[in-house]
Structures are given as C-alpha cells and as structure tokens.
Design a protein with these regions (language model features):
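Extended alpha-helical, oligomerization-prone segments that build pores/tubes and scaffolds
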Residues: 1-194
Length: 194
C-alpha cells in the first residue's frame, strides 16, 4: 500500500518520488545538504487502518531548505550525533476575514516525542517581490515576540528529520560542492571584463 501511495504522492501535494528526489538533489547541490521532515496529519478520529486509508491519512515528506533550519542540538553523551532538538523557520498563512490572509513567521521546535510551534505576534508589514509572501525570514530581529500557538506529542522516539548531504563537513553542515566552480567562473568573468 505505502509503496504505491509514495510513488504517486510523497509530499501530499501531488509530487511523485522522482520529482521530490530531483528537488532534493538540486537543493543539496546548491547548499551542500538538504533536509526532509516526515510529518503525519493531526488525529481525525479514525478508529481503524481502513478508515485512515479512506481519509488519506498517511505520513508525508516536507522538503526543508537548509536556510530555514535555525539551529539544532546534538546528543553529545549517550548517543553521539543524534539530534535532540531542531528549530525550523516556517511561514504561517492565516485566514483574515472572508477573503484575506495574514502571513506570520513561526518557528517549529521538534524534540524526540514532542513538538512546539511559536508564532511571531506581529505580522510582517513589508512584502517583497511580486509574491504575496515575505521573501525571507528576518533572523536579525531579536526583539520579535513569539507566542506558543501549538504543541503536541508523537510516539516516535526520535526527530523525524533526514539530512541528505552532497558534501558533508560535519553533522548538519556541509560545503556546497559547486562552490569552487562558481568562484572560478566569477574570477574568469572578472578577468574578461578588464
């Protein structure tokens, strides 16, 4: 059952496994690594596996850009290198009236067996570019107030985040594999411009 479902729709948005893997590869080549977070919909009251399948409740994969991973903690004692916490920046689009929407910065904090979501209290006023979403997170705003808007537990005893490396330097860090070529191209074009 799962093989057929994941081959057709791995992320809950209609992307098949090939398309999803292609996006991860592009991200890993760009940044040196990328992440996949495995999530599961909130409980819906289904009482059997057949009911869950009828409601299409199943795990799905979320591509996490490395620039949105704000920080992490590793177990340095018992199980060296295992994640004990990860903080992921997200955008929350909240309905505002009949037709409007508000976009908030939020941070998802995931630890083994539990998660919390903190949302910035004030909506970002400036929108950049032709899209209705802010272009990037403003991590420099240390005075921003965040409030806890969601929390919960899950039965998995570890953080469901998988990191794919193209050029690993350490846990959760890497060097973009094409960076040297980019610098060489830049130097070439600068010499040609003179």
């Amino acid at each position: 059952y799962w093989t057929d479902v994941f081959n057709k729709d791995v992320d809950g948005c209609g992307s098949d496994l090939d398309e999803y893997a292609r996006r991860l590869l592009i991200c890993a080549l760009t940044y040196g690594h990328c992440h996949t977070l495995v999530d599961f919909p909130a409980p819906s009251g289904a009482r059997s596996l057949a009911e869950e399948r009828a409601l299409n409740r199943r795990p799905y994969w979320i591509e996490v850009d490395p620039t949105n991973v704000y920080g992490w903690r590793l177990d340095r004692e018992a199980n060296y290198g295992n994640l004990t916490q990860v903080r992921i920046g997200e955008k929350a689009v909240v309905p505002d009236g009949e037709f409007g929407e508000k976009v908030y910065d939020q941070v998802r904090v995931i630890e083994p067996g539990r998660y919390r979501v903190f949302r910035q209290e004030e909506q970002k006023a400036e929108m950049q570019g032709p899209f209705p979403y802010p272009a990037s997170f403003d991590q420099s705003d240390a005075t921003a107030e965040y409030e806890l808007v969601e929390s919960g537990d899950f039965s998995l005893g570890q953080i469901p985040l998988v990191t794919i490396y193209a050029n690993k330097t350490d846990t959760m860090t890497s060097k973009p594999p094409l960076l040297d070529i980019a610098h060489l191209n830049l130097a070439h074009y600068q010499r040609q411009a003179d």
